[in-house]
Amino acid sequence: MKYTSYFLALLLCVLLGFSGSYGQGQFFREIENLKEYFNASNPDVAKGGPLFSEILKNWKDESDKKIIQSQIVSFYFKLFENLKDNQIIQRSMDIIKQDMFQKFLNGSSEKLEDFKKLIQIPVDDLQTQRKAINELIKVMNDLSPKSNLRKRKRSQNLFRGRRAST
């Protein structure tokens, strides 16, 4: 747990960006509170390397980066959920969650609810597994780039048109 907490401050800064606003100062103070609570500045936390920083470096394209960031944000929401009964750090976690919510989900409460639903889905439940497999084709179709499909259809129509005119 200590190892994970060390990177909370570092990665939230990288993940969420920097800003000079008043609220951002409070955000950094709350991260410092969490670092202190988890003793995350202790040198032993660095053993084994960072959790997310090295992975984030590998994702350069902005749209690709969003994919990995969603997994990292999911991790932090799970971490905060596991610590929700800890009154000592509750305020800090609430402020950080709110900032994360604003930056990652653009303040959309509907997106937040959907995101929470997704991270709560138990992968070891047989009924859930069956439903997931049943929806797999639709999910894969949604993942396919629609613009390529349109381009392909357009080029097929052009090719057919040329063929008919010759």
Swiss-Prot record:
One of the protein's GO biological processes: humoral immune response
Residues with attached carbohydrate: N39, N106
Compartments (UniProt record): Secreted
Superkingdom of the organism of origin: Eukaryota
Pyrrolidone carboxylic acid: residues carrying this PTM: Q24
GO molecular function list: cytokine activity; type II interferon receptor binding
Family affiliation: Belongs to the type II (or gamma) interferon family.
Job description of the protein: Type II interferon produced by immune cells such as T-cells and NK cells that plays crucial roles in antimicrobial, antiviral, and antitumor responses by activating effector immune cells and enhancing antigen presentation. Primarily signals through the JAK-STAT pathway after interaction with its receptor IFNGR1 to affect gene regulation. Upon IFNG binding, IFNGR1 intracellular domain opens out to allow association of downstream signaling components JAK2, JAK1 and STAT1, leading to STAT1 activation, nuclear translocation and transcription of IFNG-regulated genes.
Protein name: Interferon gamma
Species assigned in the record: Bubalus bubalis
